[in-house]
A protein has these predicted regions:
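A short helix-loop-beta-strand connector motif used in the catalytic cores of GNAT acetyltransferases and
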Residues: 44-55, 84
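Conserved acyl-CoA
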Residues: 91, 102-119, 142
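Conserved beta-strand in the GNAT
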Residues: 61-70, 84, 89
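A short beta-loop-alpha structural element at the N-terminal edge
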Residues: 1-17
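Conserved beta-hairpin
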Residues: 50-66
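Conserved active-site alpha-helix within GNAT-family acetyltransferase domains
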Residues: 101, 113, 125-146
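Conserved GNAT-fold acetyl-CoA-binding loop/helix
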Residues: 23-43
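Conserved beta-strand-loop-alpha-helix junction that forms the acyl-donor binding cleft
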Residues: 95, 106, 117-132, 149-150
Length: 150
């Protein structure tokens, strides 16, 4: 398996397709999310900004991807740089085989290169997605906020 950092339009299209799959899955857990969203150029447009990390894993073909960005730099409000994990998706056949962990490790390594130890990664996980919640907890992430909706 190989991690490829997104650099061109072709890479971005692969990630757009993964994001559509993730959105479709999350729509089954959260009624606010529309199921048939078509993603176009989200990753391509994101690459224009500094401090964005987009990568995917291949095993002869793409099997998973990750998308994160610097939301709040250290300074005025935060004591550390806040990186938001926007999306993590692994094809079902490859889940529980270390692919997600590999992608998260690649994100953390990128963050260390950019910010040394002066960062946190924030993740929003849908409550009904217990597998994802357990996965992040297993990697050492802890609950710090709860979003309430009416």
């Amino acid at each position: 398996m190989e991690i490829i950092r997104v650099q061109n339009d072709s890479d971005c299209q692969i990630c757009d397709e993964f994001l559509e799959k993730l959105i479709k899955f999350e729509a089954g857990c959260d009624s606010l999310i529309l199921e048939n969203v078509k993603v176009k150029d989200i990753h391509k447009n994101s690459l224009k900004h500094d401090n964005v990390y987009i990568a995917y894993v291949t095993d002869k073909s793409p099997i998973g991807y990750i998308f994160a960005y610097l939301k709040n730099p250290k300074g005025k409000i935060n004591s550390k740089n806040v990186i938001v994990l926007e999306a993590l998706f692994v094809e079902e056949h490859y889940r529980r085989k270390g692919v997600g962990k590999m992608l998260m490790k690649s994100l953390e390594n990128w963050a260390k290169e950019c910010f040394e130890k002066d960062f946190v990664v924030e993740i929003t996980s849908i409550n009904k997605n217990e597998n994802a919640f357990g996965f992040y907890k297993h990697l050492g992430y802890n609950e710090v906020k709860t979003i309430l909706r009416k």
